[in-house]
Amino acid sequence: MMKIITFKIPEETLLLLDAYAIKHNMNRSEVIRLAIEKLVVDEMKNEPVPRARVEKIKF
């Protein structure tokens, strides 16, 4: 299930986003999801997942 988010973006960036969307026959949401995936998901694939250190509780 996808969540709806709202954010502000500079008008110049929005114009570039729209131009990219038109060129690639995509809508704004598709372009934004692709950009986030490229930036965040691809980068995180190369980093280890942080894990919390948990110690046993002694009774």
UniProtKB/Swiss-Prot annotation:
Protein name: Uncharacterized protein 59
Upper classification of the organism: Viruses, Adnaviria, Zilligvirae, Taleaviricota, Tokiviricetes
InterPro entries per the UniProt record, alphabetical: Arc_rbn_hlx_hlx, CopG, Ribbon_hlx_hlx
Any GO BP: regulation of DNA-templated transcription
